[in-house]
């Protein structure tokens, strides 16, 4: 099948999109990607890029906007992107059997622009009104449209079983769960903490508020026995860079590929996934860091009452602390250094039995096999 993925970031990197595209390309589908480059203004640029071992046609449009700046500040760029989606689909309508829309900010335009016989898969990374700063006056309207699209889609994908609770008004024709779990791209041999003196903390992701980024930087700057390895991009990047310049135990990597991320995390001791539980969507979050910690066998620190924190607590594979007390998690795991090896073994077992990408990719391939079969009837 000819599949068009649409994403509201440049997919450079975007681990979930990359894995899904690679999986479908491997299964024999002809996949192309339309993505939003927010760094600068430019017309659509076409490149051929490798996703796994497979070449994919990628189209990126540049519409300058600011990550994590909120709905109001990015409204104009968002509207421009909606128009760009419509125009792109119209131009390539004969090359599309299925539109795979990632989140509401691509689903809105693509659903109402899709060719009549085109199938529609709605991949809900984050439930929009619970995740983004949508003005109160618009939330009801946005949720109604979102629900309509879910109900009319050929399939809806969510990233954890818990997310079903968010789809409170919708009744999708088909609903499947694909966890944000990584493929095994690097050696996963457990690295003993005795191989280096400092406790190495790893974080790679969006550098924005609501994730205890600056709080972690401050803690590490004041505690020489720890070392923070941090990568990513976002609104807090200048402040993170400043911490790194002023503290030799904070190392900033900037934007990293997914393979680089996993490799760096594998050289560290502890992963963190702090999300502010006051944000409704964070209660259902499925952080990449959770799955990466399982696959790599690294103890994980999470905030209480956020997605997957109960799994960490139940299986004793890290530390779960109040969001306002990240330092408690660091000190708790430092004191439990002797338990890290056992935690690692439990994590890898969980990954293999419940969350492996092999299992997730089988679900995705089966979905598209079924769509293809129903198309040929």
Locate predicted features:
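Conserved donor-binding/catalytic core segment of Leloir-type glycosyltransferases
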Residues: 2-4, 157, 193-221, 228-229, ...
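N-terminal strand-loop element at the rim of the active site
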Residues: 4-12, 26-76, 163-168, 177, ...
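Nucleotide-sugar-dependent
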Residues: 11, 15, 211, 257-265, ...
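Donor nucleotide-sugar binding/catalytic pocket of nucleotide-sugar-dependent glycosyltransferases
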Residues: 35, 129, 143-189, 196, ...
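Nucleotide-sugar donor phosphate/pyrophosphate-binding loop at the beta->alpha transition
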Residues: 76-80, 118-121, 129-148, 184-187, ...
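Membrane-proximal helix-turn-helix segments that form the acceptor-binding/catalytic region
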Residues: 83-90, 108, 112-116, 122, ...
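Nucleotide-activated donor-binding/catalytic signature segment of Leloir-type glycosyltransferases, i.e.
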Residues: 238-265
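A short, well-ordered alpha-helix in the C-terminal region of glycosyltransferases
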Residues: 332, 339-354, 363-366
